[in-house]
């Protein structure tokens, strides 16, 4: 299902291949025979964004986190389809990674869409494995494209998730006043 979805999104002259020779299939975007003279624009963009990496240094590029609401929803769905889990009852979802930065980026992405997220760390180094970061997510929108996950999603919240930034617009330019409180960090509640 993911393979078909990605294939349909590719520009003309490209196709998606799967190498199943390893325990974890590797997907590659390759040029079709009639497009061999051109540079692979997907590989060029992956390199430009610094995404040609693996393992515990993966991340979400800043420009992706600052995309439109629709782009950020699609990003979350792509991440959740490939690395997300959903409980049998459909009310608990999480994203698992061995990259601390990617876990923090997913948390930030969820917050930007009005959801709640928290990261739990599981140290599996004593078993010869990496540290695992599990991002527990609560969000109103359905974060899945995959049918088996999408149909099971049944969010239940103890409190409403309402924090999100829809847009930022210039209002006016004017003088501002700065307030400070007599404490070492100068913080206060309003």
What are the residue ranges of the model-derived segments?
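Internal intein/HINT superfamily modules and their associated LAGLIDADG
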Residues: 1-190
